[in-house]
Amino acid sequence: MLISACTTEDRKKETAMTKEKIFKIISDAEDAFGLAHQGDDLEKIKKTALDFHALVHPAEVSGTKEKTIADFVFDYMATGHQNDIVPRQDYDVDLKYAGTNAVPLCWHFWHTYRIEDLVSNILMSNGKQIFNDEWKEKIGASITDTGNALEYDEAVSFGKSINVPNLRRYMIAVGKNTREIINGLTLEQIKTKVPEEWVMRILEEGGVTVDFRSVWLLVFWGRLTVGGMLSIPITDHHMMHLTPCVNNLPIEF
């Protein structure tokens, strides 16, 4: 019995997720998508994009049974930590095109999913974004844009009003919708840049502000093909913001 118990315990340790294991799995998925994106195999591009997308979104988005890095961070936030202050990113970068470099934890989720909503629906499919006045009220958001240009006091104030359960509902809606969009893409779309008028819709609909620390996003996105958007911001952008949360908070895996 002792040997059996030890064996079972050892197996649990071997299969238990750690931050390092999760980061390695995600890194491998990113590499697989990057390699596929260089080619013309449409189904492989979409599959690797969806695999990568699944790993950096809550498990409910893709229907996977195992918790993802997004689940671990969100679950921590949902236990009264939405206003924990964390770095905006974990690498050395010039933030002259940004507001505060320290933000409430909930800002990271707002920022990444507002951007995913705008890019996937308006730029990748010329459709209608999910966010509207009803979602704004449910989430308790004081803004409609991505929050790029918020100063520290503004970001702190923003975080205090956020309804975490409804923010999660918005995240799930955005993530599931993005997967449908990815499944419907053609190779021609993936290899093509989008019209300028689509890009300008984001400003017209309040997705960015006229502050240069916000509006520069339009220039950046306008230079990307749809395939490029599948990386930044649909997948890799999430890891850019989940990583500082994991590295600077006592989140258990």
What does each model-identified segment do?
Residues 1-7:
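N-terminal export/membrane-targeting signals
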Residues 6, 13-106, 115-253:
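Aromatic-glycine hotspot motif
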Residues 109:
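Conserved H-X4-D acyltransferase segment
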